[in-house]
């Protein structure tokens, strides 16, 4: 019995405590970045689990796909009304597994394994609410009781067992073929997922991108405007709308104002805002899109920086200041660009970002400012092992131990100094 305690209960308790500690750490500020609170997530997940179970026991040839950001959040016990029944049903499944553990061990194991397997990704960690792939491992034992019944010659209903043994694999094979035909067809994915997920901004943006690439510019514009009426703060929708309007040749002030509103109020300022704006800067510099030049790009960058959720989301404040620095540099405001780049470092000490920014300053003909900025990276900040929060911290520690960053800093400093010495 002592061995059982050490081999079973101690690891189980350690894992449980670890998950709860991680949940406490990562749930800080979750409402500002996810759009729901941790309590709302815990209320919603029982409904999600029953949706997963329906996919397993009532399979459909076509799934909602990858775009699940339109899933309705449970705001309390009764909204939606399925919240309380789902919670009660989840407790009921646990009681069934416990009650039948001696008489039906396979059934109890299948239920228990599924619930435990879902307890992390569908539990207190503030992940996205819904993803189909979370069903894979927890469902590994789901159909073991059915297989035992089908292969047991002593059970009743032999004709039903025979028909099920032949018909069920054929049915599942047919639905698998139908599903694979969609997953192997990008245009089919865009159309089907867009139609099946009308409340998903991701699905609508994905379908609009496909329509734009097919030359259906007006259809893409209409789709994005319809989606924006329900989701006015979604950056992916306004960013794609700007792309559509620029394809048409001009961005009017009303659409720019809608974009500024979205960038400044989006509760989940993901890296999408940074990547899209950074990709749009070359277009703004050469002014190939009427109504969208560097001043307009600067408005969006300032809106991103002024968003109240930006300082809360890890890394986004640094991204915002980097964008402002890029806009200032492209506009010829060298010292303003340096101040913004320095502010990005103050927000998050990332040596790779400093190297990129110093290279940008040097490429713009500002080697002295580049050397001044590079000096910030002379004392890299590396978290001690007991403060590691993610693999990113581990990776930074490894690179620091290997002297990688110092080598990169010395190499870039040498190139900039050489250019400065040989410049006229």
Region annotations inferred by a language model:
Residues 1-245, 249-251, 260-269, 291:
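Polytopic membrane enzymes that build or remodel cell-surface glycoconjugates and lipids
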């Amino acid at each position: 019995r002592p061995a059982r305690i050490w081999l079973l209960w101690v690891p189980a308790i350690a894992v449980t405590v670890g998950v709860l500690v991680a949940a406490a750490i990562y749930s800080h500020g979750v409402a500002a970045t996810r759009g729901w609170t941790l309590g709302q997530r815990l209320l919603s997940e029982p409904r999600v689990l029953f949706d997963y179970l329906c996919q397993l026991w009532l399979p459909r040839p076509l799934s909602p796909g990858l775009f699940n950001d339109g899933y309705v959040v449970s705001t309390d016990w009764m909204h939606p009304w399925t919240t309380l029944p789902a919670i009660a049903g989840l407790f009921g499944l646990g009681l069934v597994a416990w009650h039948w553990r001696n008489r039906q061990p396979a059934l109890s194991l299948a239920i228990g394994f599924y619930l435990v397997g879902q307890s992390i990704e569908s539990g207190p960690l503030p992940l996205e609410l819904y993803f189909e792939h979370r069903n894979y491992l927890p469902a590994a034992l789901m159909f073991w009781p059915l297989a035992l019944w089908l292969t047991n010659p002593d059970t009743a209903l032999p004709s039903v067992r025979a028909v099920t043994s032949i018909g069920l694999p054929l049915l599942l094979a047919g639905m698998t073929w139908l599903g694979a035909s969609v997953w192997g067809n990008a245009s089919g994915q865009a159309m089907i997922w867009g139609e099946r997920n009308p409340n998903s901004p991701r699905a609508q943006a994905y379908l609009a991108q496909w329509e734009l690439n097919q030359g259906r510019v007006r259809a893409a514009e209409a789709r994005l405007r319809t989606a924006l009426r329900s989701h006015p703060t979604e950056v992916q929708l306004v960013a794609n709308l700007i792309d559509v309007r620029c394809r048409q040749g001009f961005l009017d002030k009303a659409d720019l104002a809608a974009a500024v509103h979205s960038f400044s109020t989006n509760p989940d300022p993901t890296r999408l805002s940074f990547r899209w704006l950074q990709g749009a800067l070359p277009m703004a510099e050469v002014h190939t899109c009427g109504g969208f030049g560097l001043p307009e790009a600067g408005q969006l960058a300032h809106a991103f920086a002024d968003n109240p959720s930006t300082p809360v989301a890890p890394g986004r404040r640094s991204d915002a200041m980097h964008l402002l620095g890029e806009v200032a540099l492209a506009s010829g405001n060298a010292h303003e660009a340096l101040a913004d780049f320095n502010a990005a470092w103050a927000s998050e000490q990332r040596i790779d970002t400093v190297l990129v920014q110093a290279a940008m300053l040097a490429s713009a003909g500002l080697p002295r400012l580049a050397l001044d900025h590079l000096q910030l990276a002379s004392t890299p900040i590396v978290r001690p092992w007991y403060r590691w929060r993610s693999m990113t911290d581990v990776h930074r520690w490894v690179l620091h131990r290997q002297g990688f960053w110092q080598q990169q800093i010395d190499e870039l400093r040498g190139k900039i100094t050489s250019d400065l010495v040989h410049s006229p």
